[in-house]
Amino acid sequence: MDLYGEEPMETRRSDFGMRLKQCMDKYGPLCVGIDPHRKILTDWGYNVDAEGAELFSMRMLQAAHGRAAAVKFQTPMFERYGSRGFAALERVLYAARQMGIITIVDCLHGGLSTTISAIADAYFKPGAPLLADAITLLPYYGARSLSGLIDEALDNGRGVFIASLTSNQEGASLQTAIRQSGEYKGKTVAYGIASTAQKHNADIEGMGSVGLIIGATIGQWIKDSGVDPAKFTGPILSPGYGWQGAEAKDLKTVFRGTSGNVLVTVSRFIAAHGPDIAMLSQATESIALDVRQALLEATEEHHAEDDEESSAFGRATETSTPLTFVPVDGNGAQQSSAATRQPSDPAADGE
């Protein structure tokens, strides 16, 4: 039993993905971001302190309850208040658990093996002070450096989201850089991260528990990365919708062909309607519907194009000899069969 009197539950490595998928199927693909910015606290008439951040968070939880699949807490917004801020985050995480809401802590942790156990103690293990369903990770030490922490999460029925293609413009130069060595030599950094993450989901039936962060604002940049979200079987956390500029058309561009595993996070776009709980709830419901429809159209358009291509190919083969496809590289030169990307590779771009 932990300090809040909660009994630990028997867990499986696939638990987080299963629970998140159930909530997404029931409530839609919206994750409400709980980010107590100074300006929002002031606009709401709350004190800019730990107490104000906690009051704001509790109100956002009420709006999200029964209307969104998950909530995401931005830890720096609590860290700025020191120990009182962390205590506030503990309490709102506990409240979310009591309400049955899936929680994601956006802490962007990472590091060496010496720090992994400490992070697991804080977020994953029974009795953890900041017990969450999932946290975000930063793979700058190398995606494989996260393996131990991922195992800790999965062994405790939790999940992770690894930053792969972020919504900030500064990320492009690093994330689309070509790797010079290792297993994914010649591929982009983002491709290597996505492929490494997918390995943890490969043997899981249904949606896995190791996810990616792919921003909704990246647009056609998704093609430069070599990452195909449609071939990734874990959850995808997507910031950038609303306040940061992404619209429904951007979701359809980036997540074309995906099938129910994209979780769109929206924070200030919802919070701007507060503090009135009725207005917050209405905004949450409206945005949830918009996001669901955009992602549904992304899937349907992809399938429609595939059906059209299949029909055209069928008509062509009725009157012509069998076609032989010769793979080419980006410069139009033929590749050897050894260099051909396999369809089963989850991070391969959809060509």
Segments the model singles out, each with a brief description of its role:
Residues M24-D25, L61-R67, L93-Q98, I150-N156, ...:
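Acidic (Asp/Glu)-rich catalytic clusters
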